[in-house]
Design a protein with these regions (language model features):
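Catalytic-core signal marking the mid-to-C-terminal active-site face
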Residues: 146-295
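Phosphate-binding chemistry for phosphorylated carbohydrates and sugar-nucleotides
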Residues: 1-161, 249
């Protein structure tokens, strides 16, 4: 399957969640450019994986001199940004699409890059490299002598945890989907300072990207609404053809409370799920009370 995740790699997920699971489980797609990382009883989101690789890259021989910068696609969680801030390096936020990382890698502005859809790579090659990511995880396990659950627990203890999930609503009638996004865009300017589902909006915009290398500009790259306290909801539309459109909703919330680090992400994101529905009127407009795919 082109998307290695807990839904499509269910057999591997079940094995890694069972008693006696091995130290590391990993999956990739058919051509090896995407990856999924698992430990005993532990699923590592692509966003968290990128952050852990950045925080521990100095333990790997090829990156012992440190990183020049990191880059993530806009819908990817901001976990890696927290690592970059502590390391004192640049963190770039790009539109979805690997091509946007290319200029940053070629110009030496970023060493590691990644996206929530399980693509990870570095400046050793201009493309995403799932096998490299798995090997780098093995390097980190060997260098630290820690398990995947221990590495994640230590990472969250230092940086806090960004709970993250993507909800896909598939096969929505194209005119309904387009109307939903148009209405969402129309009210962005009025959202800051208002309260939605019990959370106060800090900022709202439609993401645009100015490439720092070649000066090009990419507009209309997704609607994002951020909340005080670290919450965020991102809305993107894809596939507006005859088979209908897919609405992708990317949900994120942050905590630095150790008592919450072990919470189930869907429970921890309840505020953001409610806020996203209230903002976009998903249930009212589509009749859907739950996403078709939740990762």
């Amino acid at each position: 399957h082109p998307d290695p995740n807990p839904i499509w790699a269910r057999e591997l997920m079940d094995a890694m969640m069972a008693d006696g699971a091995p130290d590391l489980g990993a999956a990739s797609d058919g051509d090896g450019d995407r990856n999924m990382i698992l430990g005993p009883g532990t699923y590592v989101t692509p966003s968290d994986s990128l952050a852990v690789l950045a925080a521990n890259a100095h333990l790997c021989p090829g990156y012992s001199g440190g990183l020049t910068g990191v880059a993530r696609s806009m819908p990817t969680s901001r976990a890696v940004d927290r690592v970059a801030e502590k390391l004192g390096i640049a963190a770039y936020e790009t539109p979805t699409g690997w091509k946007f990382f290319g200029n940053l890698l070629d110009a030496g502005r970023a060493t590691l890059c990644g996206e929530e859809s399980a693509g990870t790579g570095s400046d050793h090659v201009r493309e995403k490299d799932g096998l490299w990511a798995v090997l780098m995880w093995l390097d980190i396990l060997a260098a630290t002598g820690k398990s995947v659950p221990q590495i994640m627990a230590d990472h969250w203890a230092e940086y806090g945890r960004d709970f993250y999930s993507r909800h896909d609503y598939e096969g929505i009638e194209s005119d309904i989907a387009a109307g939903l996004m148009d209405d969402l865009r129309a009210k962005l300017g009025d959202l800051p300072g208002t309260e939605v589902a019990g959370r106060r909006v800090a900022a709202a915009d439609e993401f645009a990207y100015d490439d720092p290398v070649d000066g090009s500009r990419a507009e209309g790259q997704g609607v994002r609404v951020t909340f005080h306290g670290g919450g965020r909801a991102v809305f993107r539309l894809s596939g507006t053809g005859t088979s209908g459109a897919t609405l992708r909703v990317y949900l994120e919330d942050y905590t630095d409370d150790p008592a919450r680090f072990g919470d189930d992400p869907q429970v921890a994101l309840a505020d953001m799920i409610a806020a996203a529905d209230a903002l976009a009127g998903i249930a009212e407009r589509t009749g859907r009370t739950a996403p078709d795919v939740r990762t």
